[in-house]
Amino acid sequence: MRVSEPSDVVIRSDDTCHIHLTWSGSERRSAAKQHARKVAMKLGVSSGLIYLVGQPTVNWGDSDQPQPFRQRRYFYYLSGIDEPDCYLTYDIQADLLTLYVPDFDLRRAVWMGPTLTIEEAHKQSDVDRVNFFAALQHDLEWWTTKNKGTRPIYVLHDSQQPLIPSKRLWLDNERLLPAMNAARVIKDEYELRMIRQANYISGLAHRKILEDIHRMSTEAEIESSFLATCVSHGAKNQSYAIIAGSGENAAVLHYVKNNEPLDGRQLVCLDAGAEWRCYASDVTRTIPLWTDWPSERARNIYRVVEEMQEECIRRIRKGVRFRDLQLLAHDIAIKGLQKLDILTNDCTSAIYESGASAVFFPHGLGHHVGLEVHDVSKRPITALDGNQANWGNHNFVPLLTDSSWSVPLLDEGMVVTIEPGIYFNRLALLNAQNQPLAKYINFDEAEKYIPIGGVRIEDDILVTAKGYENLTTAPKGEEMLEIIRRGIDNS
């Protein structure tokens, strides 16, 4: 269905579906002012000036062609403006949020169309004032002179500080970034509407591929279909590069070449999510390239990953340690692989501590989602260094801290992914044979699964006051198989 207005599609933990096809004009405006106040609260100050620089127009090296524009996400959080060459200030004491847009340029307007006007900016954002860039320098000097260096100007980085000819300038480049990270990790209603819409469009694109997969012959066709559906529904940008890995490519976590044929392969791992007004979705589905599971091995691995995801999602609620869900996912993976004779029947904790399960499940269970697909937070969600396995350690043992106090808890308003996976990567298995953990792996049996590649299932989950809400609408499991069958029957 082609929609002319954004839609809210919500799949809640009780499996009910709610669809709203219209928004009021006020709902289209960003929540920039609310975000600015939230950041000031996280800073813990009552005065000072926040100064942010938007993404400038930049050409490719040795070229007159501009690089694709992508707004700086911290700037968007406080402005709601997705246009280049803008600036922003927030006077904390005066509670005054001011946006500066590019000056009118007739030549540019003739060639490229006019830049953002003051009136248009007010329609898009709830900032207090909008001025042209020409006023920025004067306003900054006026504020600095007025405060005589007694109040700081907060900037994200040294490279983004204002050029003010003053010897009494007080710049703080340390406190703003962590304050904004702490603010961004909890999403408000405006942000949730954006993330729901991104998921809704992603769901349409995933569904379209399921309907047509029997006609497709290459990974590139899958990618192009996903892009076409997203763009036709107003989502021109993707949250990240599309991953459409078939066969052994499904075992490469960030495979983005998407240039090989599907013929003779069992599964395709499709990791693709649309972006809506700078907010991300992150969705993965593993699709059989047959009317049903192409092999018992493929079905069995899918079922293990399905259980990993369902059990972890079921336990999401405020106050839960995400680290514990990561451990639960590994426990389910180990027991599932033991039943398939891929791992030995030793103690699950010994297998986990050896790193043997990480040969098959080498990444974190999930991450925050928001303005970035791997969104910011005050601390890593699993207390992992970088929220990943230690890739410098060839044993692939995840660095999970044992210090309970340092592990962050899930909180209401967080949006996190639950994305377990099991992979049979030829290089990872070859490397594991030379490690102490090899005693826990039946390599002869594991190698039989290499043609499957890997299985990953990923949804975006909102932590609510009473539990969770699944924001992802893309079909999976039996619903996915039924859509594939109907597509063949209707062709």
Swiss-Prot record:
Q: Which InterPro entries match?
A: Aminopep_P_N (IPR007865), Creatin/AminoP/Spt16_N (IPR029149), Creatinase/aminopeptidase-like (IPR036005), Pept_M24 (IPR000994), Peptidase_M24B_aminopep-P_CS (IPR001131), X-Pro_dipept-like (IPR052433)
**Which GO molecular-function terms appear in the entry?**
manganese ion binding; metalloaminopeptidase activity
Enzyme Commission identifier(s): 3.4.11.9
Pfam families membership? AMP_N, Peptidase_M24
The reaction(s) annotated as catalysed by this protein in its Swiss-Prot or TrEMBL entry are: Release of any N-terminal amino acid, including proline, that is linked to proline, even from a dipeptide or tripeptide
Which top-level group of life is the source organism from? Eukaryota
Q: Where does Mn(2+) 2 bind?
A: 271, 282, 458
The alphabetized UniProt keywords are: Aminopeptidase, Hydrolase, Manganese, Metal-binding, Metalloprotease, Protease
Required co-factors: Mn(2+)
Binding residues for Mn(2+) 1: 282, 419, 458
Q: How is the cofactor bound?
A: Binds 2 manganese ions per subunit.
- Signal peptide boundaries: none
Which biological process, per GO, is one annotated for this protein? proteolysis
Q: Does the keyword Protease apply?
A: yes
Q: To which protein family does this belong?
A: Belongs to the peptidase M24B family.
- Which function does this protein serve? Catalyzes the removal of a penultimate prolyl residue from the N-termini of peptides.
Know the name of this protein?
Answer: Probable Xaa-Pro aminopeptidase AFLA_084750
The organism's taxonomy opens as: Eukaryota, Fungi, Dikarya, Ascomycota, Pezizomycotina
